[in-house]
Amino acid sequence: MPQQTQTQVETSTSSSSLSQTQTEQQSGPSPPQDQQVQGVLRLRPDSATDTKNKNKSKKKKPKVRWTEDVVDNEHMNKKKTKICCIFHPQRSFDDEMAEHNHEHDHGHCDSSDSDSSSDLSSDESEEENGNKLPSNGRGSDKDKLYKPNSYEYQPHYENKSRVQL
């Protein structure tokens, strides 16, 4: 009895796929069941699919590039944008004296007339400038400017990092 062998060949192109079936007739005795030849299926990716997968795996994440004037965090090669410690730059004695004199020469008087309309308008203008007054109810404290301590003050940094795509 002739044996029929069926072979299936698939051809794939980038726009469509083609399937072809071939049937062969063989005459002669068939090999026993344990000696039948088994085919090996080898799958190969389409060249267009292969390049897409390579591009996805090699896609670079954006990296931050620091400029030369960014300060190293405590000399440990860790340049960070977070606030980790408070830095007070050293000043010369002349600068400290000039600032000290400036703080006490604002023209404020120590009068107890804190309920007048002129004091109210000066308080509003000080709050607009970012200097908030303490609200503890004492009249003499209203004449002093409130300065936040180092932990309350948020510095205004200029973004010096560069993102490389």
Swiss-Prot record:
Bias kind Basic and acidic residues: ranges: 43-53, 65-76, 96-111, 155-165
Gene: YPI1
Residue ranges, annotated region (Disordered): 1-81, 96-165
Organism: Lodderomyces elongisporus (strain ATCC 11503 / CBS 2605 / JCM 1781 / NBRC 1676 / NRRL YB-4239)
Gene Ontology process terms (BP): glycogen metabolic process; intracellular monoatomic ion homeostasis; mitotic spindle assembly checkpoint signaling; regulation of protein localization to nucleus
Annotated Low complexity bias: 1-40
GO annotation, cellular component aspect: nucleus; protein phosphatase type 1 complex
InterPro entries in alphabetical order: PPI_Ypi1 (IPR011107)
Protein name, UniProt field: Type 1 phosphatases regulator YPI1
Keywords from the UniProt entry: Nucleus
Subcellular location: Nucleus
Pfam families: PPI_Ypi1
Chain segments annotated as coiled-coil in the UniProt record: none
Biased composition (Basic residues): 54-64
GO molecular function, one term: protein phosphatase 1 binding
PANTHER family: E3 UBIQUITIN-PROTEIN LIGASE PPP1R11, E3 UBIQUITIN-PROTEIN LIGASE PPP1R11-RELATED
Highest taxon, organism lineage: Eukaryota
Family that this chain belongs to: Belongs to the YPI1 family.
Its biological purpose: Regulator of type 1 phosphatases which maintains protein phosphatase activity under strict control.
